[in-house]
Amino acid sequence: ASFDEAPPGNSKSGEKIFKTKCAQCHTVDKGAGHKQGPNLNGLFGRQSGTTAGYSYSTANKNMAVIWEEKTLYDYLLNPKKYIPGTKMVFPGLKKPQDRADLIAYLKESTA
C-alpha cells in the first residue's frame, strides 16, 4: 500500500517511535552532529546521500531519492529492500500506522 492509502499520522505517537527505534542512530536537532546515522534535520526535499559531513554508502548516494512522505513511507517498510546496500541496519516498520506516525513526527521535527 502506498502513502496515499496510509492512515493519518499522529506526530506524538511518531515521537515515541523515533525515541525507541531511531534516536540511537539519528538526531533531528538543527546544528547537531551526526550519530551512527546522519542528522535528519532538513530531511524533506533532500536527496539521499547528500548531507554534508556524513559518510554515506555508495548505494544511498546512487539511489538519489528525494525524501518526502511517499518515498519515506516506502523506504521505512523495508530499508534494505528499498536501497540495497544501505548501511542502515534498521529492519523497518511493518505497520502502516507506525510509518504514518513517524513521518508526521519527522515532518514537524526536521523542518
Curated annotation (Swiss-Prot):
Spell out which residues are annotated as carrying N6,N6,N6-trimethyllysine: 80, 94
GO MF, one annotated term:
electron transfer activity
What domain of life?
Answer: Eukaryota
Acetylation: is it a keyword of this entry?
A: yes
Cystine links in this protein are: none
- Modifications made to the protein after synthesis: Binds 1 heme c group covalently per subunit.
SUPFAM superfamilies for the chain: Cytochrome c (SSF46626)
Modified-residue entries (N-acetylalanine), positions: 1
Q: Where in the cell is it found?
A: Mitochondrion intermembrane space
GO CC term (a single one): mitochondrial intermembrane space
- What is this protein for, i.e. what is its function? Electron carrier protein. The oxidized form of the cytochrome c heme group can accept an electron from the heme group of the cytochrome c1 subunit of cytochrome reductase. Cytochrome c then transfers this electron to the cytochrome oxidase complex, the final protein carrier in the mitochondrial electron-transport chain.
Mind telling me what this protein is named? Cytochrome c
Q: Which organism is it from?
A: Vigna radiata var. radiata
